[in-house]
Amino acid sequence: MSAASPLRWQLIEHAPLRALNTFHVDATARWLLNIHAPEALPDALAAPQIAGQPLLVLGSGSNVLLAGDPPGCVLCFDNRDITIIAHHADHAIVRAGAGVNWHGLVMYSLQQGLSGLENLALIPGTVGACPIQNIGAYGAQVSDFIHVVEAYDRGTEQFVRLNPAECAFGYRDSVFKQQPDRYLIVAVEFNLPLLHELRLDYAGIRDELARMGAELAGAADVAQAVINIRQRKLPDPEVLGNAGSFFKNPLLPSEQIAALQASFADMPVFPGEQPGQGKLSAAWLIEQCGWKGKREGDAGISEAHALVLVNHGSASGAQLLAFARQVAESVRERYSVILEPEPRVIGAHW
């Protein structure tokens, strides 16, 4: 059964979600709402079948673990327009709809001679999801280049434009993550420079550029280097179900870092997000506990990267969650460090 407003939105009952999450776990949405025109949101949300129901927004399902059927309604945005809305001498403002593929936007920006997003190449997901997690990789995070987030405020039932301060961005955090039931992101505007200082001092980017023979590297070269590295390290979700890095790198006070280094001298430590803080490598902690490449049934940790929780075939979301909890518990027991998941866990508590 389905209901629709022609070309604007569509409501589908009892929709399977296996194809809408990159772990490829089975789950069913009581209602699936496809939004083709964001301005139709108020009308669509007032549909009697879903009015007042909980909402789960799914982009490509690359940052979620469905440990059970989501309650209420699952919402997907299908607006995939990209527009350069302002040109300036040294930068441009690019607007992308929530349904735009993230990597597609990165490559589009590079083709337009714009930089800034190159270190974030090949991150799975959609533009609408990127501010929620404040996606980051290889020394960059998307909040550095967000100009405005356009959203529908379910509390006031109004469309709003939020600047970066109002988005309350932090490490893998934002107001959208802190208040998941309030805002529905419909588009994002990016402030992208024509030229900016390239971030090369992270995770082998310089070495990869050297292998590529890119002596005078530009933003497009950095993007290709990142793509090469990610393709070597991270399994393709179409081949092996996963959501990329499953665990956050722990941020700890400097005093706790020093105490850990006194006991584990080879423990790698990176600068934190704030003074008096350091960042540990969750991958290192997990590998030291012997989990890299380990599996129980079809739930496991990738052989190539210890941060990546994988579904080898038919693991359920609940089985993947239980396995991830075992990993986190072993790290806590050995290092007294608490690991937290990057993806949002639906249908169960972490």
Swiss-Prot record:
Pfam families, per database record: FAD_binding_4, MurB_C
Residue intervals of the FAD-binding PCMH-type domain: 24-195
Entry GO terms, CC: cytosol
Keywords of the record: Cell cycle, Cell division, Cell shape, Cell wall biogenesis/degradation, Cytoplasm, FAD, Flavoprotein, NADP, Oxidoreductase, Peptidoglycan synthesis
Single GO molecular function: FAD binding
Recorded metabolic or biological pathway in which this protein acts: Cell wall biogenesis; peptidoglycan biosynthesis
Enzyme Commission numbers on file: 1.3.1.98
Enzyme class (EC, first level): oxidoreductase
Top-level taxon of origin: Bacteria
Catalysed reaction, written as an equation: UDP-N-acetyl-alpha-D-muramate + NADP(+) = UDP-N-acetyl-3-O-(1-carboxyvinyl)-alpha-D-glucosamine + NADPH + H(+)
Predominant location: cytoplasm
CC cofactor: FAD
GO biological process entries: cell division; cell wall organization; peptidoglycan biosynthetic process; regulation of cell shape
Cellular localization per UniProt: Cytoplasm
Active site: R172, S245 (proton donor), E342
PANTHER family: UDP-N-ACETYLENOLPYRUVOYLGLUCOSAMINE REDUCTASE (PTHR21071:SF4)
Role: Cell wall formation.
Family named by the database record: Belongs to the MurB family.
Protein name: UDP-N-acetylenolpyruvoylglucosamine reductase
Species name: Xanthomonas campestris pv. campestris (strain ATCC 33913 / DSM 3586 / NCPPB 528 / LMG 568 / P 25)
